């Protein structure tokens, strides 16, 4: 299998054409005709991850966060130069899929969590189109028990919480990554909790004034889910050597 074949698989699975994204989805650096030796899957194409990909002898790095974003300067200098230099020195083809991997209803960063935790009556959630997140219901429990359940799933303690809602909860909305502003939409949808990755100062007041729980588990932790699931998917799609590269990024 070559990189072009892999791109066909990924495009058919993730449908990037449906999304107006913040950066290019698909092959960002490399040659589409390269024969695949080993695929490394990760959250972000930072220098540490690129070095890990080189060390494990991968020649394809597939990530959620690539190295090109809208509004970047055209010049290739500084950190961007260093990353591209190591990619090319290691003969690594870089592939990235951003919003399509958030939104996928089976292996995405949001829907997979809801399915794994047994939420029911699942519906798309979020103000963007297509929607990136998911909402659902679950058996009523104490909010602190719900937080513990999520912490165990994400394998990290909650980084920020604003408990503005009721003591017992039975519904939630989830958008991974930097979606704290969607708390207002969560209230509009009448769920008990809103879960995301990042947090910022307004979230505290909004949670209490809207009478909803706000829970943030970190951008990285909430966006490992999709890449891990994608790695497993590719193993079943004919790729013999696929690894997930973890990171110790707590943000």
Swiss-Prot record:
Residues annotated for a divalent metal cation 2 binding in this entry: 65, 219, 223
The protein's assembly and partners: Homohexamer.
Protein name, UniProt field: GTP cyclohydrolase 1 type 2 homolog
Transmembrane helix found in the keyword field: no
Binding-site positions, a divalent metal cation 1: 64, 102, 223
InterPro entries (alphabetical): DUF34/NIF3, DUF34/NIF3_sf
Protein family (similarity comment): Belongs to the GTP cyclohydrolase I type 2/NIF3 family.
Gene Ontology, cellular component aspect: cytoplasm
Keyword Secreted: no
Alphabetized UniProt keyword annotations: Metal-binding
SUPFAM superfamilies in alphabetical order: NIF3 (NGG1p interacting factor 3)-like
GO molecular function: metal ion binding
Organism: Chlamydia trachomatis serovar D (strain ATCC VR-885 / DSM 19411 / UW-3/Cx)
Top-level division of the source organism's lineage: Bacteria
């Amino acid at each position: 299998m070559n990189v072009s074949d892999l791109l066909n698989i990924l495009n058919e699975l993730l449908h990037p054409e449906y999304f107006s994204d913040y950066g290019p989805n698909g092959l960002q650096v490399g040659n589409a005709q390269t024969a695949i030796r080993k695929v490394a899957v990760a959250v972000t194409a930072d220098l540490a991850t690129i070095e890990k990909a080189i060390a494990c002898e991968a020649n394809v790095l597939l990530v959620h966060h690539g190295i090109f974003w809208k509004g970047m300067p055209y010049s290739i200098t500084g950190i961007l130069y260093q990353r591209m230099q190591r990619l090319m020195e290691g003969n690594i083809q870089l592939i990235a899929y951003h919003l399509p991997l958030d939104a996928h209803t089976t292996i995405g960063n949001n829907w997979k969590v809801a399915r794994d935790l047994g939420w029911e009556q699942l519906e798309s959630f979020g103000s963007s189109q297509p929607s990136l997140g998911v909402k659902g219901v679950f058996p009523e429990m104490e909010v602190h028990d719900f937080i513990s359940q999520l912490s165990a799933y994400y394998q990290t303690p909650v980084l920020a919480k604003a408990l503005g809602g009721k003591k017992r909860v039975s519904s939630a909305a989830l958008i991974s990554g930097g979606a704290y502003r969607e708390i207002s939409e969560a209230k509009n949808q009448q769920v008990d909790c809103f879960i995301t990755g990042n947090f910022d100062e307004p979230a505290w007041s909004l949670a209490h004034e809207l009478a909803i729980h706000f829970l943030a588990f970190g951008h990285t932790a909430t966006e490992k889910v999709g890449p891990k699931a994608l790695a497993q998917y590719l193993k079943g799609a004919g790729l013999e050597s696929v690894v997930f590269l973890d990171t110790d990024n707590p943000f």
